[in-house]
Amino acid sequence: MVRLFRSGSNPKEIDISQPNSLVHKVHVDLDLNWSSGGETSFEIQEKLGEGSFGSVYRAIHKSSNTSIAIKEFEIFEANDVEPISKEIQILKKCNNPYVVSYFGSIMLKNKYWILMDYCSLSSFNDIMQSIGKTFKEKEISLILQQSLLGLVYLHSKQIIHRDIKSANILLDETGQVKIADFGVSQQIQSTFSKGSIAGTPYWMAPEILNQTDYNNKIDVWSLGIVAIELADGEPPLSEVNPMRAMYMIGRRPPPTFKDPKKWSPEFVSFVDKCLTKDINERWSPSQLLDHPFIKSAKPDALKELTQMAIKLKSKKRKSIGPSVSPKQQPNDNNNNNNNNKPQFLSKLLNNNSNSSNDIGETTSGSVIYKPNVFSGSIDTGSVVIHNTITSNNNDSGSVVLNSNTVINRSKPLPPPPSYESVILNDKLKQQQQQQQQSNQQTTTTTTKQNTIKNKFNTISNTIKCNTILVQDKTLEIIQKTPMKNLDERNQKIVLYSTLGLILVLSVFFKFFK
């Protein structure tokens, strides 16, 4: 039996978190795993989103009528659980109003549920797409202030998020900002940690891409990119292929706004402090909280935005109805809810990924490259991954890795097809090849015919022009040579020759036409 109680109702229960002034207490073991059959305690309301990791749903806990978010993962083999367990271990350490709360997990037959805070207004990336415009400076100030408070807490727990971006910063109906998605987060044991490349390309810090020692200030760099993203609508270099962007970030000067003059000097200064390339000179989250731009944040700056987002959310829900029937299981394959994504993000998210030994499995839409995998060519600007060169002109947003295409996302592989389906696929493949060969032959024949026809048309037009010219010249000669000056024999020769020439040319022209 799974329950959620108000504070003080049962001191023997385990306190999990305190979202929205409600203390969630549940019957769980020491690892916060819910008792068997816990999934029946929830009523799935709608599908909130879908990513490489799986899907997120809004659910109602029946006995308490509390809304929560369920992050569902498909499990196909034992090692699929490892990245999920890693995210859970990070979430278990967090109990802060600026970080998404973790309520527990449920392991089912072929899926895994993580139960978390429900932030009804979704991410700031989604809100920006819904309202169709970027945010005001006063709104950005408060968003960044609360995000910094979340980072201060995470860093105090020795947790580096490594994937800070607007899509991972959420907003609830009370105007509370929360950091989410710890799929590529890392628990560090020392001040510096040299490790793998992780995160989303446009938001990555240069020290990660250059594979030098880094610390928790990589999250500050990412937050600086978020500041530009919220102001300009997209991160710097968003028009560039992700792999090319990764090369450029490590070698170019720090980015800034598209038009810095549009923003206050305090805002520009804040971004400069975040995007200092020297990690030792870059400000920490605690220092940034004392920056004039952050200290100017008003507590009610998000009130108008929150109300607007609530109205848009309600309007959208009424127009499309619930995307998941309460009787359906969350992993129903018939449920689709495509989120609006900026065009630059579709490069990263709207493709299927293939597995690779050099790409780490994550529970987010981000990628982890193992240490010493990534290197750049200063001369060509190409990206080399285990001696495999990825072209700069690759517009698909994919990474060529040892002849495999790896998108910036990870997903468990589906079970292998049955023997019958393999045979069927082979037959279909043969038929397709035969059809392609037939189409190629038809195309070749048609092309040859068109070529010959074009040549004949050209010859015909030339003959036609020349025939008219010959006729004109012949008449001109006849007119200049009076027939009366010729004897009867020569007159006949001229006349018959002219008529014969005209007749031959006419027949020739008619044949080619």
Swiss-Prot record:
Record-listed ATP binding positions: 48-56, 71
GO biological process: intracellular signal transduction; protein phosphorylation; regulation of MAPK cascade
Record has Calcium as a keyword: no
UniProt subcellular location: Membrane
GO molecular function, one term: metal ion binding
UniProt entry tagged with the keyword Secreted: no
Membrane topology: Single-pass membrane protein
Segments passing through the bilayer: 493-512
InterPro entries (UniProt xref): Kinase-like_dom_sf, Prot_kinase_dom, Protein_kinase_ATP_BS, Ser/Thr_kinase_AS, STE20/SPS1-PAK
Superkingdom classification of source: Eukaryota
CDD domains cross-referenced by the UniProt entry: STKc_MST1_2 (cd06612)
Region (Disordered): 313-358
Sorted UniProt keywords: ATP-binding, Kinase, Magnesium, Membrane, Metal-binding, Nucleotide-binding, Serine/threonine-protein kinase, Transferase, Transmembrane, Transmembrane helix
Family label: Belongs to the protein kinase superfamily. STE Ser/Thr protein kinase family. STE20 subfamily.
The protein's name in its UniProt record: Serine/threonine-protein kinase pakH
